[in-house]
């Protein structure tokens, strides 16, 4: 009877892991890998941009709307854009052909940067870390280079995916409150400065979480729709008082804009978490401190 050493047996039984992919890829990289077995490509949008996908997308790409497919249902009085249950996300991913050996590339159309980074965060949360990438420049960069596009939706075979949720990527109000004075943790507000400074509000309280730094989400991507260089991003983080080695916890209004700053933090090598409830959650808790209000 043939026997295998325990180490080889465990390796044989372990789920297949695709080689790690860079979190940010170029159009050249995607063109070179577009026909790889196991590659799943998503054009990110919503109901307003579905028509764009129907008329033009990267060949083989599927349409993904994170605001509806990767979120809890919208209910009056409930928090918006919260992560749904793992089983719900697993069902969505499998229906789109995602399996344990898949490698995923996300790209924006019409500069939908924050929904794209939110989708990236969700996939990382589900345990796909190291196998998910964002296409730098999105559909616009792909088309500008004269690369092929299609209007044909791909035929998708359901996948089999085993989720490994990473709860450590998600922060809640309790975590944020407990680390407001922690020098090893930096809370970062990703909203426009008008909200950070308290001139505008969406959630009934003006200002920002006490002690939070400001890195507006608009500063992460340049006017051409590509991510700023690591040196530029690091300089912006440093200017906001964020130090190397700190854990970065990002928030915004509902957890979407914050995902773009979270992604940038990950690119720079920071340990990063996203406060999923964000200011919509913090502001409704009267006992939690807010500062920066303007008269």
Feature locations, PLM:
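Hydrophobic h-region of N-terminal signal peptides that target proteins for export
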Residues: 2-19
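Active-site neighborhoods of enzymes that stabilize oxyanions during catalysis
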Residues: 19-26, 32, 72, 139-210, ...
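Mature N-terminal segment immediately following signal peptide/propeptide cleavage
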Residues: 20-48, 60-66
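Loop/turn elements at helix/coil->beta-strand transitions in domains of secreted/extracellular proteins
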Residues: 36-40, 59, 100-103, 183-186, ...
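Solvent-exposed loop/turn segments at secondary-structure junctions
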Residues: 46-49, 67-71, 110-114, 139-141, ...
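Helix-loop module immediately N-terminal to the HCX5R catalytic loop
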Residues: 73-102, 217-248
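Thiolate-centered catalytic microenvironments shared by cysteine-dependent enzyme domains
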Residues: 80-175, 179, 200, 257-273, ...
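C-terminal soluble interaction/assembly domains
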Residues: 233-235, 240-295
